[in-house]
Amino acid sequence: MTNNEKVINNKKSTDSSKLFRYQAKFVAGAMNINQIPNFLLPEIAFIGKSNVGKSSLINTICNNKNLAKVSNIPGRTGQINFFNLADKLIIVDLPGYGFANVPISVKEQWEVLISYYLRNSNNLRLVNLLIDSRRGIKENDKKVAELLLKNKRSFQIIFTKFDKVTDCKNLTDEAQNFLTTLHYSCNVMYVSSRSKEGARELKASLAKCIIKPQRSKGR
């Protein structure tokens, strides 16, 4: 039994295999708040530090390596990107945070954009907070988690690049201690875009979002 299977109690979802069998497509990019669309469909968002592997993970779960642009240069995703999956789900790729070599004015613009989206989206069901398995949870990640709770957004923690670490026990302990300080409970998952480990479990958790709304369990 893998760590992810323990997290979701071994529940398999045929809905996820059916949903992610469809081809996702890019439908909009928003560089400012006036460009944020309303598709009237459930949305699930991905957020994390620059170069955490957001685009690669989105490509992995959508089975399309060219869907979200992948770059080794941190800070390349400078807008909110929206992808439509079978007219059933909108996948939202939020700009990365924590990259130092970006002008302060640009950082502030991204912060305004992200904060506005998290505060105002009526369709957002779940946020996936991505953490690099090699780095662990950093101060910027904690601030984002607090922002999510402040806006009453449900989230789950996704440790990316899991193929590059040998043991998840320290990560699990770190995540649980972190969640305890937040007085929040959520899934903690481990995924590798390279080996595909954890991808099926992640898809299952996302597919649930089109069935029923996700409510914050904190505070």
From Swiss-Prot:
Cofactor(s) this protein cannot do without: Mg(2+)
CDD domains from the UniProt entry: YihA_EngB (cd01876)
Membrane as UniProt keyword: no
Cross-referenced Gene3D superfamilies: P-loop containing nucleotide triphosphate hydrolases
Signal sequence, renumbered to the chain: none
One GO MF term attached to the UniProt entry: metal ion binding
PROSITE patterns associated with the record: G_ENGB
Chain positions recorded as GTP binding sites: 48-55, 75-79, 93-96, 160-163, 191-193
Its biological purpose: Necessary for normal cell division and for the maintenance of normal septation.
Homology family: Belongs to the TRAFAC class TrmE-Era-EngA-EngB-Septin-like GTPase superfamily. EngB GTPase family.
Protein name per Swiss-Prot or TrEMBL: Probable GTP-binding protein EngB
Species name: Rickettsia canadensis (strain McKiel)
